[in-house]
């Protein structure tokens, strides 16, 4: 009951902040925040991405002719693949995992109660491949339980966790484990997912997202201390760190965000390794994209509510930038909503003590935002072209994705944050088969 009261109070507070600004100061100030918060964050991402590239990334070996990574003391690596109804993808995924140039690996596929032919495919492959172990769960328990099961069965201290449709690059496992060998406080490393599905407008737009937004965000967050979340499709973990925090939570809709915060709130560090490439399938329909992003946004809100009080301990001060960024982005979304409502009420002729003359960007603000989109594209293209040379084929969509990114964030934040604050609950988070694209690119 207390959690419900607190969460309802938070929702009211988020709504009241823009209303108070508009009422006690001016509606124009409120709308300036709407226009310039994305502007400020984009500058942060550009500066952070460039800094990470100049002082770290550009010095790292990479390329077709680069030698296979040599890991200190030749540790074993366990690649864990949780699978649910992956009959179309799992065989290709396992073959890519086994094709690593680093040889001291084992692959563990966890069949999470699949109802298609996944079980039969895994059993056939396990009989033929010595380095492959298969675990079958009788019923669908959710990705968190599947990952826990794989971790319990693994022989290695270093766990590389990927989705059942993900294709690892030939050196991804070695690259993503390497930072943990040189820093004993690195508890997890997040990789660099790349989009395979590009046959529709929705697919091409996501190429722009992962090229011009996601990579810059990860680089920037790594520079100022902590990462909001590891990638759910490719991440490596130190098993002792997972054991310390209780592994993955089975009641959180996004186990990747939750485990990232659990590790960092226990003083473990998360590193970003852009050379750990992983090729993934993504939604290519608007319905599939909406469901996926709504789930991501809801996961962020759940983690925020879960850790809100713990964040204020002085030992967690490095998490404060992430906390304030999340709070301000959420307030930004509700400020947009309040602005639209006020403007609509004024158009209807209802008298208000708040004056709002426009909700669209001014000429100057529009030019600034468009220029920043172009600059962000140029920076991301210069950095990401190292890993994916055909990005110019998606040139048009990449340029405009920053605008689409913020609009999508606006809609999903409004829906998910309201849902979580009004209906906080604890139940097992189980997965369903997502939209995996219409045609593989």
From Swiss-Prot:
Keyword Cell cycle on entry: no
GO biological process, one term: cell adhesion involved in biofilm formation
Stored Gene3D superfamilies: Spore Coat Polysaccharide Biosynthesis Protein SpsA, Chain A
Kinase in keyword set: no
Location(s) in or outside the cell: Cell inner membrane
GO cellular component, one term: plasma membrane
InterPro entries: Glyco_trans_2-like, Nucleotide-diphossugar_trans, PGA_PgaC/IcaA
Topology Cytoplasmic: residue spans: 26-32, 352-362, 416-441
EC number per UniProt: 2.4.1.-
Molecular function in Gene Ontology: acetylglucosaminyltransferase activity
Membrane spanning stretches: 5-25, 33-53, 331-351, 363-383, 395-415
Family the entry assigns: Belongs to the glycosyltransferase 2 family.
Record NCBIfam families: PgaC_IcaA (TIGR03937)
Protein role: Probable N-acetylglucosaminyltransferase that catalyzes the polymerization of single monomer units of UDP-N-acetylglucosamine to produce the linear homomer poly-beta-1,6-N-acetyl-D-glucosamine (PGA), a biofilm adhesin polysaccharide.
Name assigned to this protein: Poly-beta-1,6-N-acetyl-D-glucosamine synthase
Native source organism of the sequence: Escherichia coli (strain K12)
Classification lineage: Bacteria, Pseudomonadati, Pseudomonadota, Gammaproteobacteria, Enterobacterales
């Amino acid at each position: 009951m207390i959690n419900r009261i607190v969460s309802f109070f938070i929702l009211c507070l988020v709504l009241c902040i823009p209303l108070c600004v508009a009422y006690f100061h001016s509606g124009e100030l409120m709308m300036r925040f709407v226009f310039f918060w994305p502007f400020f964050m984009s500058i942060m991402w550009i500066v952070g991405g460039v800094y990470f590239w100049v002082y770290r990334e550009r010095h790292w070996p990479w390329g077709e002719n680069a030698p296979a990574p040599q890991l200190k003391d030749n540790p074993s690596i366990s690649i864990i693949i949780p699978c649910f109804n992956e009959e179309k993808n799992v065989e290709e995924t396992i073959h890519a995992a086994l094709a690593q140039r680093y040889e001291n690996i084992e692959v563990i596929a966890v069949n999470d109660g699949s109802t298609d032919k996944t079980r039969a495919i895994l059993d056939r492959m396990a009989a033929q491949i010595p380095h492959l172990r298969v675990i079958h769960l009788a019923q669908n328990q959710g990705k968190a339980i599947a990952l826990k099961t794989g971790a319990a069965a693994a022989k290695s201290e270093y766990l590389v966790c990927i989705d059942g449709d993900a294709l690892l690059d030939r050196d991804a496992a070695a690259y993503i484990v390497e930072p943990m060998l040189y820093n004993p406080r690195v508890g997890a490393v997040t990789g660099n997912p790349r989009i395979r599905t590009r046959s529709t407008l929705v697919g091409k737009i996501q190429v722009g997202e992962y090229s011009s937004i996601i990579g810059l965000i990860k680089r920037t967050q790594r520079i100022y201390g902590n990462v909001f979340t590891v990638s759910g499709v490719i991440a490596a973990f130190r098993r002792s760190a997972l054991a310390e925090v209780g592994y993955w939570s089975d009641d959180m809709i996004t186990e990747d965000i939750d485990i990232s915060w659990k590790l960092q709130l226990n003083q473990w560090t998360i590193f970003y390794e852009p050379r750990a490439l992983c090729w993934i399938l993504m939604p290519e329909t608007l319905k599939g994209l909406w469901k996926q992003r709504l789930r991501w946004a809801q996961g962020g809100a759940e983690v925020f509510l879960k850790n809100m009080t713990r964040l204020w301990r002085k030992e967690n001060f490095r998490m404060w930038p992430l906390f304030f960024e999340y709070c301000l982005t959420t307030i930004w979304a509700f400020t947009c909503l309040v602005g639209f409502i006020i403007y609509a009420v004024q158009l209807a002729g209802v008298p208000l003590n708040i004056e709002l003359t426009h909700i669209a960007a001014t000429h100057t603000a529009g030019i600034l935002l468009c220029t920043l989109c172009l600059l962000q594209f140029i920076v991301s293209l210069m950095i990401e072209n190292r890993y994916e040379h055909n990005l110019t084929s998606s040139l048009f969509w990449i340029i405009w994705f920053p605008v689409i990114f913020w609009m999508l964030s606006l809609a999903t934040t409004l829906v998910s944050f309201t849902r979580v604050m009004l209906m906080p609950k604890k139940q097992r988070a189980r997965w369903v088969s997502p939209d995996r694209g219409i045609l593989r690119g």
